[in-house]
């Protein structure tokens, strides 16, 4: 594999595609709102800003669709005054969509309810680097992003690849917390949520993963997709366990106080919609099941599609055009929906998340 293949430089799908298919992330975000409220109360109580603006940084904003409610929750618990809201993501992110999302929201705020003077900013930088100046932030948060690794560790003879990913995930989270400790003032807070391994042993959205895998195998078997492309497809994530996270926190205890660290499952809301449809008079089970398959597969593809397009380039040494790659992708999506409907009809799409609330000492 070429060195460029190890770099995690693939953004979520742009032009609003990711933001249109981030419903499960939205469910996880809602579960993080009480932590953000508590974190904001801690900041308001602990931090003497000396007339400087309150600064809030989001690490991994994507298109901003799941950034707004957290920011509203923070504003709700913050006294009137100047507040800087920083939205950050990798340089490859679709910042045009993010800008539209943030600007539309900020300009439409009810000034009677939110008399704050709001100063939005966007920073194109990975959260595995320092994002804002040292001791300039009061509150930080990152939702549904930290399971994405900085890069894919290169294979080592005699070392299990999962062990390499586990080590990389440990180093990444440790680096993330050390960087945020530089940026966030003493008394400040940090709230995190990210995809995790369920302590029950249940695999996250197993049916979807199986359908994706079978669809790609099907494309290779019938000669549609080169095997080298399928072999190059990889999503550089690692789902940590609670124990993994606690080990990292133990290493930063002199700098951070951990107030809450817990695991919780999130169900894709399309399943609730499906159950509601079953009670309607004009319920068509086949149509409803196909629509459910469309929604949950589109959700997963909003994250995976960019990595698939990268695999087409890497696995073919750039012999395919962008149009070719998009055709491969459309075929893969179509087949994945077919396999999910056939083999996992109406199956729950559940994902485990870890939630963390930290205070900067």
UniProtKB/Swiss-Prot annotation:
Binds 1 Mg(2+) ion per subunit. S-adenosyl-L-homocysteine binds at residues 18, 66, 89, 126-127. Mg(2+) binds at residues 156, 233. Pathway: Mycotoxin biosynthesis. Keywords: Magnesium, Metal-binding, Methyltransferase, S-adenosyl-L-methionine, Transferase. GO terms for molecular function: metal ion binding; methyltransferase activity. One of its GO terms (biological process) is methylation. Disruption phenotype: Abolishes the production of lucilactaene and NG-391, and leads to the accumulation of demethyllucilactaene and (8Z)-demethyllucilactaene. Its EC number is 2.1.1.-. InterPro entries: MeTrfase_7, MeTrfase_capping, SAM-dependent_MTases_sf. Its cofactor is Mg(2+). Pfam families: Methyltransf_7. Belongs to the methyltransferase superfamily. Type-7 methyltransferase family. Methyltransferase; part of the gene cluster that mediates the biosynthesis of the mycotoxin lucilactaene and the lucilactaene-related compound NG-391 that act as cell cycle inhibitors with potent growth inhibitory activity against malarial parasites, moderate growth inhibitory activity against cancer cells, and no activity against bacteria and fungi. This is Methyltransferase LUC1. It comes from Fusarium sp. The lineage of its organism: Eukaryota, Fungi, Dikarya, Ascomycota, Pezizomycotina. The gene is LUC1.
